[in-house]
C-alpha cells in the first residue's frame, strides 16, 4: 500500500465540503490505490456539525481513509499537508459590495497563507475554491513566501465543465467527445469561455455552432451559470463545485490525458500578454505532478478583447487588497 497523502480541507462542514469529503475518501481524487489522511478545518461554531460529518465518514468504513483530524486552528489542519483545498470563505451578505467581500476574505486567506507557510509540506498543492477564488489564492500565496508561488491555484474547472456541458447539449455530442475547451481569466461573470480551439468528435467546434449562439447564448450562459443555479435551487452550486475541485486536483496530480488540456487558474507568468502575478485561468497540461500553460495558441481580436476584460477585473481586485498584502 502507498503511504497516505495528507489532504487538508477548510470549511469542511459546509455544503461543498459535505459533497467533497466522501468523494476524496472513496478514491475519486487521487486514485483507488492511494490512502488519505483527512485534516479538516472549521470555524469554532461549526465544530459540532463537523463532528457529525466525521461520524458519517467513519460509518462509511472507507478502505482508503487512514485517519481523520479536525481543528479550528489552521496550523493544526495544515500540518504536513500535501494537498490543501481552501473551500471555506466569507459569503457575500446583503448590502455587501465586492470590495467588502474582498477585504473580509483577505483576512481569512492571509491567515491561511501564513499557516500553510509555517506548517504544510514544502510541496503542498493549494486549490482555492472559496470566492473570490482567484484573488483569495493570490492573498494566500503572498502570505506564504517560503512556498513555491506556482503551487497556489484557483478553480475554474467548474466553469470549464459547465462550458463542456453546454457545448455537448448544443451539438448532441457526449461531454467525453469534447476536447480542449478553454476558460480564460477570473472565476466570475467576466470569465471568457473560448471554443476557438475546441474539438467536438474531432471536428472544430466553431464550424458546428452559429456565431450568434456562441457570442450571445453560450458565453453568457456559462458566465452566469452560478447565479442561475442559486435562482433555481435556492442555494449555490455545491456538488458540482466539489466535483470540479476533484477533477482539478486529480489532473494536477495524475496528469491530463495525452494531447488534451484543462483550465486552471494559476499565477500568470506573462503568457499571452497577461499581467504577471495575478491568478488567471489558462489552458494547462499536467504531468508528473506539475502543470504547464499551453503556449503559442493563436488569439484573434474577439478573444483578445475578452481576455483583457477579465484581466482588468483581476488587476482591480488585486489593487483593492494590495494594502493588505505583504
UniProtKB/Swiss-Prot annotation:
It comes from Alkalilimnicola ehrlichii (strain ATCC BAA-1101 / DSM 17681 / MLHE-1). One of its GO terms (biological process) is malate metabolic process. Substrate binds at residues 92, 98, 131, 162. It catalyses: (S)-malate + NAD(+) = oxaloacetate + NADH + H(+). This is Malate dehydrogenase. The active site is at residue 187. Belongs to the LDH/MDH superfamily. MDH type 2 family. Catalyzes the reversible oxidation of malate to oxaloacetate. It is an enzyme of class 1 (oxidoreductase). Keywords: NAD, Oxidoreductase, Tricarboxylic acid cycle. Its EC number is 1.1.1.37. NAD(+) binds at residues 11-17, 105, 112, 129-131. The keyword NAD applies. The keyword Oxidoreductase applies. Disulfide bonds: none annotated. SUPFAM superfamilies: LDH C-terminal domain-like (SSF56327), NAD(P)-binding Rossmann-fold domains (SSF51735). Pfam families: Ldh_1_C (PF02866), Ldh_1_N (PF00056). It comes from the Bacteria. GO terms for molecular function: L-malate dehydrogenase (NAD+) activity. The gene is mdh. InterPro entries: L-lactate/malate_DH, Lactate/malate_DH_C, Lactate/malate_DH_N, Lactate_DH/Glyco_Ohase_4_C, Malate_DH_AS, Malate_DH_type2, NAD(P)-bd_dom_sf.
Amino acid at each position: 500500500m502507498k503511504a497516505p497523502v495528507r489532504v487538508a480541507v477548510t470549511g469542511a462542514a459546509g455544503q461543498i465540503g459535505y459533497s467533497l469529503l466522501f468523494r476524496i475518501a472513496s478514491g475519486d481524487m487521487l486514485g483507488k490505490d492511494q490512502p488519505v489522511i483527512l485534516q479538516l478545518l472549521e470555524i469554532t461554531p461549526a465544530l459540532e456539525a463537523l463532528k457529525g460529518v466525521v461520524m458519517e465518514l467513519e460509518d462509511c468504513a472507507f478502505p482508503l481513509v487512514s485517519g481523520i483530524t479536525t481543528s479550528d486552528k489552521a496550523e493544526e489542519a495544515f500540518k504536513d499537508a500535501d494537498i490543501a483545498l481552501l473551500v471555506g470563505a466569507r459569503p457575500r451578505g446583503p448590502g455587501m459590495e465586492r470590495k467588502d467581500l474582498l477585504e473580509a476574505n483577505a483576512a481569512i486567506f492571509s491567515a491561511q497563507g501564513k499557516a500553510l507557510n509555517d506548517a504544510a509540506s514544502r510541496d503542498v498543492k493549494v486549490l482555492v475554491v472559496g470566492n473570490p477564488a482567484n484573488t483569495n489564492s493570490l492573498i494566500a500565496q503572498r502570505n506564504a513566501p517560503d512556498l513555491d508561488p506556482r503551487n497556489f491555484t484557483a478553480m475554474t474547472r467548474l466553469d470549464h465543465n459547465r462550458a463542456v456541458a453546454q457545448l455537448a447539449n448544443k451539438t448532441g455530442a457526449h461531454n467525453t467527445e469534447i476536447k480542449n475547451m478553454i476558460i480564460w481569466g477570473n472565476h466570475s461573470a467576466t470569465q471568457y469561455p473560448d471554443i476557438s480551439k475546441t474539438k467536438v468528435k474531432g471536428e472544430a467546434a466553431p464550424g458546428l455552432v452559429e456565431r450568434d449562439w456562441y457570442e450571445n447564448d453560450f458565453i453568457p450562459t456559462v458566465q452566469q451559470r452560478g447565479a442561475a443555479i442559486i435562482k433555481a435551487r435556492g442555494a449555490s452550486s455545491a456538488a458540482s463545485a466539489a466535483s470540479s475541485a476533484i477533477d482539478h486536483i486529480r489532473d494536477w496530480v495524475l496528469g491530463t490525458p495525452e494531447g488534451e488540456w484543462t483550465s486552471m487558474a494559476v499565477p500568470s507568468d506573462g503568457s499571452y500578454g497577461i499581467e504577471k502575478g495575478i491568478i488567471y485561468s489558462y489552458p494547462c497540461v499536467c504531468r508528473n505532478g506539475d502543470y504547464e500553460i499551453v503556449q503559442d495558441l493563436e488569439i484573434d481580436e474577439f478573444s483578445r478583447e475578452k481576455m483583457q476584460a477579465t484581466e482588468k477585473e483581476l488587476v482591480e481586485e488585486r489593487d483593492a487588497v494590495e494594502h493588505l498584502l505583504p
